[in-house]
Curated annotation (Swiss-Prot):
Function: Specifically dimethylates two adjacent adenosines (A1518 and A1519) in the loop of a conserved hairpin near the 3'-end of 16S rRNA in the 30S particle. May play a critical role in biogenesis of 30S subunits.
Main location: cytoplasm
Gene Ontology MF terms: 16S rRNA (adenine(1518)-N(6)/adenine(1519)-N(6))-dimethyltransferase activity; RNA binding
This protein's record includes keyword Transferase: yes
Species: Rhizobium meliloti (strain 1021) (Ensifer meliloti)
Any Gene Ontology CC annotation: cytosol
Lineage start: Bacteria, Pseudomonadati, Pseudomonadota, Alphaproteobacteria, Hyphomicrobiales
Protein name: Ribosomal RNA small subunit methyltransferase A
């Protein structure tokens, strides 16, 4: 890709700007430019699309997204050391890269939307799950984004796509299964990063379901939190604080079942009975 976009190799960029990855920021820089292109392509067509990227670091994925024709990239980076490297990319693609120095957990993402939006990110490990939940829980649906193509630790990716009776099924699987169609795209080995993480990563692609089962996000969160907080117990016990057997009877669910056996539809039924 260095030849494709005319920019220097990422290793040179990192060395020139002194960008050692900070563990406190959950940073692992992805240096394999073939992989950054693969992530960007997984998102689908990027022409006429604004892409929001969180944690671009030295900009390997940013470069891939711009090279594949995104109308604009809005990159949110809290590490000020990375800003000069990103500014060089912005100079190479005039008017197509907006850089915001901020904590992604504090950003109003919907306000950044300018026409169709795709979120593409190698998310910092320490905030990735919380950001995903934030993007899934707005009151209005469909959301401001057309799709999300995100990298997580593989264990988190498995939780995102898990369904009932899967060992990885939990609150995240219910939430993602309720409002999105989610799939695992491909794995990324530790050696693709600097420094190499101790675990394999995976890219997950999510698209919003146009008309999910009507249900209050806050109440669904409350039900899944109670049910999976004691996942090995029968529902009559784990849901006791929310009404226990009376709630389950109202929803038509056997009180002897356990949380991991319930479908997304059944969790929504419980939430709607509260």
């Amino acid at each position: 890709m260095a030849a494709l976009d005319g920019l220097p190799p990422l290793r040179d960029v990192i060395q020139r700007h002194g960008l050692d990855a900070k563990k406190a920021l959950g940073q692992n820089f992805l240096l394999d430019l073939n992989l950054t292109q693969k992530i960007a392509r997984t998102a689908g067509p990027l022409e006429d699309v604004t892409v929001i990227e969180v944690g671009p670091g030295p900009g390997g994925l940013t470069r891939a997204i711009l090279a594949l024709g995104a109308k604009k990239v809005v990159a949110i980076e809290r590490d000020s050391r990375c800003l000069p490297a990103l500014a060089e990319i912005g100079a190479h693609y005039p008017g197509r890269l907006d850089i915001i120095e901020d904590d992604a957990l504090k950003v109003d993402f919907e306000a950044l939307a300018d026409g169709p939006v795709r979120i593409i990110a190698n998310l910092p490990y320490n905030v990735g799950t919380q950001l995903l939940v934030n993007w899934l829980l707005p009151g209005l649906w469909p959301p401001f984004w057309q799709s999300m193509t995100l990298m997580f630790q593989r264990e988190v990716g498995l939780r995102i796509v898990a369904g009932a009776d899967d060992d990885h099924y939990g609150r995240l699987g219910v939430l993602c299964g309720w409002r999105t169609k989610a799939r695992l795209a491909f794995d990324v080995p530790p050696q693709a990063f600097t420094p190499p993480p101790k675990v394999t990563s995976t890219v997950v692609h999510l698209e919003p379901v146009e008309a999910p089962i009507p249900c209050s996000p806050a109440v669904l969160e409350k039900v899944t939190q109670a049910a999976f907080g004691q996942r090995r117990k029968m529902l009559r016990q784990s849901l006791k604080p929310l009404g226990g057997e009376a709630l389950l009877a109202k929803a038509g669910i056997d009180p002897q079942r356990r949380a991991e056996t319930l479908t997304v539809e059944e969790f929504c039924r419980l939430a709607n009975c509260l």
